[in-house]
Amino acid sequence: MTEIIKALEAATSLSIKPFGTDTIEDCICYSSYVISDNGAVKQEKLELRLITKTIAEAERIKPIIISTLVTVGDNKKLNYLGCELNGGGTLKDAATGTIHTLLFFVITKKSEVKL
């Protein structure tokens, strides 16, 4: 996951934080977990929360994130077999006034499990 976080940081110039943040700033918060692993192939769900002060900034950064991660056909990116956008949405935090854009990715990798 470290390689993915570094790639997102380089592409967006935003700070990347695990789980969440307690400050009002433009950033990306993430969490990930394994959804399947059969010993040959592992799939992980990467949940990103892009936090911005304006919807215009969210709309500017969102395609950068997607193009950094999503693979087309057999064109590998980073150190995984494939990545697809699996869902998301946008909402406004009424307490802070920030825009939260959710992006859910499924990342397919070679399994690290030795059977």
Predicted regions and their residues:
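Small/polar-rich, solvent-exposed N-terminal microdomains that initiate assembly or binding
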Residues: 1-38, 56, 60-63, 67, ...
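Short, charged interaction patches at domain edges and termini
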Residues: 1-10, 19-21, 33-43, 83-115
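Residue-level marker of positions within ordered structural domains that often coincide
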Residues: 53, 70, 110
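Short glycine-rich, basic-tinged beta-strand/loop micro-motifs
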Residues: 40-56
